[in-house]
Amino acid sequence: MKTDLYSSITEKISSDKFSSIFILVDENTDQFCLEIFIKKSGIKLFNKIIIASGEDNKNIDTCVSIWDQLNSYKADRKSLLINLGGGVLTDIGGFAASTYLRGIKFINIPTTLLGMV
């Protein structure tokens, strides 16, 4: 079992040959986590999708917004969605990825304890 998160992500991304990569963040993980994650993971090309933070935003309207943004960026079945955030973000991001075009691959990168369980 690997313990280096960043090398595991880099290995997964390079082995699957994704057509496009999307990173889902909220305003907090956009400000405090995204830059560090990008530098350490070595991801070069990606599209960023931002949603509002908070439990109130775990709803179908947020999911539709994610689907709309994936669609506008021309996401396809070989796209990858990386969910960088806490429990709300990983929940809604996982659901959105699982239901977009009958499911695209996603990786959860939890930033809170709740996001890890």
Predicted regions: what they are:
Residues 1-80:
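ATP/NTP phosphate-donor binding region
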Residues 58-117:
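Glycine/threonine-rich beta-strand-loop-alpha-helix active-site module
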